[in-house]
């Protein structure tokens, strides 16, 4: 693939990564859509239908009987992750949501070390600590403290960790392609989300929702669902045609834009100097993480003799 096409894939991935956060926020906070569970279900359904329509020829179906055993744990964590992620987006301001979500990096690193034996350099660990310290400071400075919203984010961080570790292990141990993993994961998530929607949703409130015929709401709602599909697909493409480091850098750029741009979206961000300082410290930690990760990658690529001369 040409450099121009690679750059285009990366740009599209980052664009949809940002757009789904903002569109979810507008749907849930500005228009006060009554069910984050239904939104999660529709996004997952869109993902499944699109892959079934466009990529079915790339999905193996000869050994489907073994798929649920292999994928179901991932699907459970993924269902919790998307539900809590959308719920957290609607409950907290985007800057605070983004900062608190960085705590999942610590959990993922601990999980990688314990389960996968992955070790990282001390500067990388320190940069993650800076991220978390910033998030804690931002939370202390949050005068709109919402215990339910914070609970959503806590569960979201745990589910993100489980999802990340299980995704790595399923790709490594069971020889699934990325498209197959997304497809089967979405398929097994659907009944879980259907049950949650049936049990928890107030269908009368959903039917009587006042903005169903508001063109602007419908635009954001449809865009939110389409962004979920596009995000899943472009994430796979970005990872395939670039590198994990490139994806990481794009994620940091996205979070910087969401952190500061999110102050003006949703109307629920309340400025305090302590909160703003915490958000900035957490963002600096995220930038340092990418820098040290890049240096670590470059160091590993050096010949052994060159490595011994450095440091």
Regions found by a protein language model. Give the residues of each.
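Polytopic endomembrane small-metabolite transporters, centered on the Drug/Metabolite Transporter
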Residues: 1-311
């Amino acid at each position: 693939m040409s450099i121009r096409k690679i750059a285009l894939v990366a740009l599209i991935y980052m664009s949809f990564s940002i757009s789904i956060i903002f569109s979810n926020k507008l749907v849930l906070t500005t228009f006060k859509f009554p069910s984050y569970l239904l939104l999660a279900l529709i996004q997952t359904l869109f993902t499944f239908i699109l892959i079934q329509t466009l990529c079915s020829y790339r999905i193996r179906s000869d050994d489907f009987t073994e798929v649920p055993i292999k994928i179901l744990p991932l699907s459970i964590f993924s269902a919790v992750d998307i539900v809590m992620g959308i719920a957290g987006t609607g409950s907290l301001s985007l800057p605070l949501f983004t900062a608190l979500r960085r705590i999942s990096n610590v959990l993922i690193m601990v999980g990688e070390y314990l389960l996968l034996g992955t070790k990282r350099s001390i500067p990388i660990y320190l940069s993650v600590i800076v991220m978390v310290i910033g998030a804690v400071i931002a939370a202390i400075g949050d005068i709109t403290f919402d215990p339910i919203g914070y609970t959503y984010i806590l569960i979201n961080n745990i589910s993100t960790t489980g999802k990340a570790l299980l995704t790595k292990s399923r790709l490594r141990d069971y020889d699934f392609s990325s498209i197959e993993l997304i497809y089967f994961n979405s398929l097994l998530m659907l009944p879980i989300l259907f049950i949650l929607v049936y049990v928890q949703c107030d269908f009368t409130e959903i039917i009587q929702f006042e903005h169903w015929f508001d063109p602007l709401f419908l635009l954001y709602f449809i865009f939110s669902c389409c962004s979920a599909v596009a995000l899943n697909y472009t994430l796979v493409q970005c990872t395939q045609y670039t590198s994990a480091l490139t994806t990481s850098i794009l994620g940091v750029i996205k979070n910087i834009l969401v952190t500061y741009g999110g102050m003006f979206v949703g109307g629920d961000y309340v400025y305090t100097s302590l909160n703003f300082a915490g958000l900035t410290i957490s963002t600096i930690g995220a930038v340092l993480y990418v820098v040290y990760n890049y240096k670590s990658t470059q160091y590993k690529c050096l010949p052994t003799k060159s490595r011994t001369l450095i440091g």
